[in-house]
């Protein structure tokens, strides 16, 4: 099986796109951008060349890092580098924000990433600042919880969990019973959502670099986590070790772990001869569960969007977009793949910064 991607639209935003959420009817997309939260009316899938312009719904006081739809697409949650969580009511017809129902500072540092449970009733945000905690520059443990689980309806905190900072990614499993997160140092933790108990905790050294050139500190780590469709294994993504962390030339990398085993076992990883160089920042599963996407920045190689078989881990599809990809999402029917990110930051022209945030839409087919 091979997966083919046919580009069916590119939509620009004033600034870089950090995350996206797509309505179940595939008619509207919401974007978390460096300068705010945007809504984009999506043209029909057949209208490949039709232009669409986003509208700003609101702003945080810093970069917006995460966005997700709640309660039948009638509310929108967003998180930011200012450490805040906001929930906005949406107009069912226009998709515009009616009011901000909730706003709270949930972290004293950045919200790196946010995830919403499959039933859309729970929000999890992860945080943490990298401060040297010892002579070997290992991170200083955080003085506050770095993982927070919040009830999306009652807006109350359900769990406050501790993990070595910075915690850079988070994901629920398909049942909503388990929560996983990854950090700079390659630590991975799986929790029970109901109790907050740690079910598995381990470290992989494959994603973290120590700078011996220019940057004498730890860098990179795990940037995306995702459970398999049966919840039995956990995938982690980022890039391989580098001697010069400023070069960004680590191997494009994912690893798969049987997290229920004692001890946890690495059971699979991306194949070296099928990957290039660059930081991988997002994972997304096709609704069928037959394959997943890993995407991010390209430093060297043939693709920055790779599609991999769930069964054998083989590369079965690819795309080279020319932009850094920060978020990937499939439509509910699996026929469309959305890729979001940014492409450089141009110099101002005539007193105005040209757009440098983008969402690309691809039609998905099998051959």
Label the predicted regions.
Residues 1-367:
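WD40-repeat beta-propeller superdomains and closely related acidic/aromatic-rich repeat-like regions
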């Amino acid at each position: 099986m091979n997966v083919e991607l046919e580009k069916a639209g590119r939509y620009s935003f004033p600034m870089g796109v950090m995350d996206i959420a797509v309505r179940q009817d595939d008619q509207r997309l919401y974007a978390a951008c460096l300068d705010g939260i945007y809504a984009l009316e999506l043209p029909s899938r057949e209208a490949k060349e039709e232009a669409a312009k986003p509208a700003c719904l609101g702003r945080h006081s810093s970069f917006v890092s995460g966005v997700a739809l709640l309660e039948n697409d009638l509310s929108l949650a967003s998180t930011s580098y200012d450490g805040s969580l906001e929930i906005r009511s949406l107009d069912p017809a226009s998709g515009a924000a009616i009011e901000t129902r909730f706003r709270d500072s949930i972290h004293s540092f950045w919200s790196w990433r946010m995830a919403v449970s499959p039933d859309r009733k729970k929000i999890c945000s992860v945080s943490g600042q990298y401060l040297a905690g010892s002579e070997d520059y290992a991170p200083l443990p955080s003085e506050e919880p770095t993982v927070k689980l919040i009830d999306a309806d009652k807006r109350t905190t359900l769990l406050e969990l501790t993990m070595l900072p910075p915690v850079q990614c988070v994901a629920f499993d398909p049942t909503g019973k388990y929560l996983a997160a990854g950090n700079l140092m390659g630590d991975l933790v799986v929790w029970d959502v109901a109790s907050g108990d740690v079910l598995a905790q381990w470290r992989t050294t494959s994603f973290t670099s120590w700078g011996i050139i220019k940057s004498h500190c730890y860098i990179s780590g795990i940037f995306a986590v995702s459970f398999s469709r049966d919840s039995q294994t956990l995938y982690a993504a980022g890039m391989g070790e580098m001697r010069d962390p400023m070069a960004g030339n680590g191997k494009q990398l994912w690893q798969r772990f049987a997290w229920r085993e004692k001890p946890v076992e690495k059971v699979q990883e991306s194949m070296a001869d099928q990957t290039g160089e660059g930081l991988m920042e997002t994972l997304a599963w096709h609704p069928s569960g037959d394959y997943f996407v890993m995407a991010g920045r390209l430093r060297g190689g043939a693709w920055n969007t790779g599609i991999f078989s769930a069964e054998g881990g083989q590369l079965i599809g690819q795309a080279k977009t020319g932009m850094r990809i920060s978020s990937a999402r499939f439509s509910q029917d699996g026929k469309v793949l959305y890729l979001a990110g940014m492409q450089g930051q141009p110099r101002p022209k005539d007193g105005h910064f040209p757009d440098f945030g983008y969402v690309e839409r691809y039609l998905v087919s099998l051959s």
